[in-house]
UniProtKB/Swiss-Prot annotation:
A Pfam family recorded for this sequence: TIM
Name recorded for this polypeptide: Triosephosphate isomerase
GO CC terms of this entry: cytoplasm
Source species of the chain: Methanothermobacter thermautotrophicus (strain ATCC 29096 / DSM 1053 / JCM 10044 / NBRC 100330 / Delta H) (Methanobacterium thermoautotrophicum)
Role of this protein: Involved in the gluconeogenesis. Catalyzes stereospecifically the conversion of dihydroxyacetone phosphate (DHAP) to D-glyceraldehyde-3-phosphate (G3P).
Phylogenetic lineage: Archaea, Methanobacteriati, Methanobacteriota, Methanomada group, Methanobacteria
Amino acid sequence: MLEDLELKDTPIVILNFKTYLESTGERALELASICGDVADETGVNMAVAPQHMDLHRVSDAVEIPVLAQHIDAVDAGGHTGSILAECARDAGAAGTLINHSEKRMQLADIEWVISRMKELEMMSVVCTNNVMTTAAAAALGPDFVAVEPPELIGSGIPVSRAEPEVITGSVDAVKKVNPEVSVLCGAGISTGDDMKAAVDLGAEGVLLASGIILADSPRDALLDLVSKV
């Protein structure tokens, strides 16, 4: 499934648009286009996770992978208000975030969505909060786990500086459990130094949001982010 996305042999940056007005509607298109341009200019893998209502328009506008922010563990049928995997796929999503700290899921539902992503040949990115949950998530066989200590999310304090042992411990744990799973890190990542430190600690990329979305110049912030990897 990842082979179909034609990811390069470089770190990956996944930008989560969350529900910021700065990354909604037309601004979602602008931000996704910036990510695509930076990916072309630098050779670093980029992916974006816009709000569900923007999935179709964003995926139509860019060549980089577009992910859903969440998919529910439901089949087609009577599940009003739920996000259906097939619907996200048909809207252009190449995969989904799972279990973000702002959208927690039960273990059985996490496993269900990962399995559904495999069936639909879509990418799965499971978010975790510490080494133990990262190891547990890796056992379920997603494509990526993204470890983010929740207290650092949006703080401007990078996990690679505040809690580097979370990254190294997660990388070591995943290698033991399922070496096919790639480890990302997030929480407070916003600069080139932050990302370089994360990669040096063993992460294969980053998941981030506000450090880019709320920057005075998202383009300049992205270029700085990938400038040292």
